[in-house]
Amino acid sequence: RDREPAARNYLSKAVNTENKLEICELDLLKDDGWDDAAQGCEYVIHVASPLVQKAPDDENEVIEPAKQGLIRALKSAIKNKVKRFVMTSSFSAVGYGHDRDVFDESHWTDPKKNIGAYNKSKAMAERAMWDHLESLPESDRIEAVAINPTLVVGPSLSDDMGTSNMFIQKMLEGSY
C-alpha cells in the first residue's frame, strides 16, 4: 500500500510541507531503504507498529516487527546524525500494572504479564529504543523522545481505513 501520495496531499492542505517532509513506507523486518530514508533528515518520526484486530496465534508476529522496525529506524537516524528521533509509542508501554494517574519515565508495563501482543510490542519496542541509546558512547547518541498517547485517530487518508479507525467505526455501530 502506498499511502505517501494521499498523506502528502492531506498534509500539504494543512501546512506548507513543500521540500520539508518526506514520507517513507518501509518493511519493518528488512534492512532495505532505512539509511536512504534518513539521509539528509533533521528529524525522524517513527510512527509504524503493527496493530491487528485479532490476537495473533504467535505474539511475535506483532512484537518482532515493532521492535525490529523501531531499531532499524533508530540506527539509521543515528547513522545520519539527525537532531531528534521521535517514537510514537503508546500508553500500553507505560500504563499497565500501575495504580496511578500520572506516569513518568520510571513507569513501565511488564511485558511478562498477560497484556496482549500489541501492548507487549509497544513496551518492548520503546524499552529497546532506550536500551540501545544507553548502550552507545555519549558522543554517538542522538536526542530521542517517545510519546505515549492512549489512542491515535484521525481522518483516513485513503480507502484503507486502518485498524484504529476501524475500531472506532465498530464501536459506533455497536458491533465491537
Give the residues covered by each predicted segment.
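NAD(P)H-binding glycine-rich loop region in Rossmannoid oxidoreductase-like domains
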Residues: 3-68
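Active-site Tyr-X1-5-Lys
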Residues: 113-144
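Residues in the short beta-alpha loop(s) of Rossmann-like NAD(P)-binding domains
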Residues: 1-4, 91
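Conserved Rossmann-fold NAD(P)-dependent oxidoreductase catalytic core, especially the SDR/UDP-sugar
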Residues: 46, 50, 55-118
